[in-house]
Amino acid sequence: MKKFLSAILALTMVLSLTACGGKSTEETTAPAGEVPASALEILENVWADYAEEEKFAVIGGSMTAPVDGAPGSYDITDENITYNLLIPADQLANVTEAASMIHMMNANTFTCGVFRLAEGVSAADFGSAMQAAVQGNMWMCGFPDTLLIKDIAGEYVLVAFGVNEAMTPFETHFSAVYPNAETLVNEPIA
């Protein structure tokens, strides 16, 4: 009887461990050279690369049309975009669309915006303007550690800032999905 129970327990354990070892095989890496369809698609692909237990409380999009628990499109005509995503007002003409994902409890913990550039706008120049805006911001209610700015296919610029506990996994997931994106800025926030 003991041998039978031991065999059943061993079999149950093997089956349980096998089931727990399964991982989603869904492809989340963007094909090399392919330009994403939208700013929102970029953030959705990165967020999809997170395991459920890694995700944190986020809100996406503009405050007039928020998306709970996921990235969302940000209306670039919404006057709050300069406050929420720190894009300088003089840079608004350089973007045609935006998407965002912000930590629900404190934007300084994690904020990310992806901006589609208007035709002829340099990703490096836009990135420099965003770097100056974020580095020059007067912070309240917490202080972000890191600023990350990436150029995606010369058509999009991702700007993310936050505490290292949020930024390190975000950069890992972003790089897994968009390995060909060029890093324009990756620096501590002064």
For each of these PLM feature ranges, what is it?
Residues 1-4, 8:
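Positively charged n-region of N-terminal signal peptides that target proteins for export
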Residues 15-19:
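C-terminal motif of bacterial Sec signal peptides marking the signal peptidase cleavage site
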Residues 21-24:
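Bacterial signal peptide processing site
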Residues 27-50:
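Post-signal peptide N-terminal segment of mature Sec-exported envelope proteins
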Residues 33, 42, 97, 105, ...:
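Long, contiguous binding/interaction regions
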Residues 47, 51-103, 122-140:
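Surface-exposed, low-hydrophobicity interaction/linker segments
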Residues 104, 116, 141-186:
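A short, solvent-exposed beta-edge/loop patch
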Residues 109-119:
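A short acidic-to-branched-hydrophobic micro-motif
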